[in-house]
Amino acid sequence: MKKLLTAIGLSLSLTLPTLAVTPGKDIQDLPDHSNAALGCMILLECMKGVEQIHADYKFKGFIPEMEEEASKIIVALDKINVGVYIGDTKYFPRYLNGIYKPDYNRFFIRRDLLDDPRGFLSTLRHEGWHTVQDCMAGGVSNPFIAQVYHDDQIPNWVKARADQLYGLAGQGAAIPWEADAIWAANQKGETAKALEACANKTLYKEYPPTPKTKEWLIGCGFMKPEGKYYPYHENKKKQECIPKK
């Protein structure tokens, strides 16, 4: 669901078309598991079987350790005003477990994953990491996302897994960001920690940006110049700092 914006490790989420659906209506007039159904949910125009969850949500069947981590992630997301929604399976294409939309600052997870605590937590970590990527790219107030881990921090098996999942699906441009999120989803507590850093405005200190992302952040005024980046010139390609319409 992303398209390549520049060659520096940033991307934009594709904008879904607005659907003429009455708020609160279910998707009986839309095909189950279709992109139209997904878009209707993302726009919060189809809300039957969809609920927003907060830190006080009770995860039935989760062991305390997993429930605690899930709650920490949701607490941090609440702090930066990113909504987390559980949606009926019919809203999701069959290949999709969850999705984060940086242009709306909300993400959605399939309801049936609640029956699989490990799968749910993994998806929550993964989509939460896309929120961290959003924060890395100048904050969640814009729709850019940037890779968080440096390439040498991501194991080769993770890169191979991302290539298998997304390359074969024709989404090769998304592989760097998806490998980034897959690696985070395999680490206990990492997403919660990074989201808390985002909320506390310490993300760049705790997770130094990649060199090209750092250069872009400074050029666009999202980050103060330092070290070899000073003195610097304002980004000459101002269109790289402004979301495409």
Q: Model-predicted segments: where are they?
A:
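Bacterial N-terminal signal peptides
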Residues: A7-P17
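Short pre-active-site segment immediately N-terminal to the catalytic Zn-binding motif
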Residues: F107-L124
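A mature extracytoplasmic/lumenal domain signature
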Residues: D88-K90, R111-L113, C135-G138
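Positively charged n-region of N-terminal signal peptides that target proteins for export
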Residues: M1-L4
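Metalloprotease/metallohydrolase-associated module, dominated by Zn2+-dependent proteases
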Residues: I80, F144-K245
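Catalytic Zn2+-binding segment of zinc metalloproteases
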Residues: G128-A146
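Auxiliary, metal-adjacent structural segments of Zn-dependent hydrolase domains
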Residues: T22, D32-D103
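Stable alpha-helical elements in mature extracytoplasmic
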Residues: E69-I73, F120, L124-G128, W177-D180, ...
